[in-house]
Amino acid sequence: MANRPTLTEIKMHSRIDTDYEDDYLIALDNSAFDFIRTYLNRDLVLDNTAELTEGQIYYTEQMRICELMLVDSWYTNRSSSEIPKACEYMLNQFRVMNT
């Protein structure tokens, strides 16, 4: 079970020293979380004491790292449409494909 990245952690990961794009970084982070949820086709549960129901999965450290990687990728390459390969490999183990 992992916690969502803080703004400070996002900025450290992306080596950002300024504050003027904080709102943009928060928006990217929320988008990254939503992307992961959609990519996995599962609801992400942050509370590890909650009982999971069908279609849910606990938010893991791998997902947290992918969230940081996505924010960094989208911040650095603002027109990028690809996800980092390492992120894709980490997330695929949790992905549920529609049938």
Locations of the language-model features?
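Divalent metal-cofactor coordination and adjacent catalytic microenvironments
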Residues: 1-99
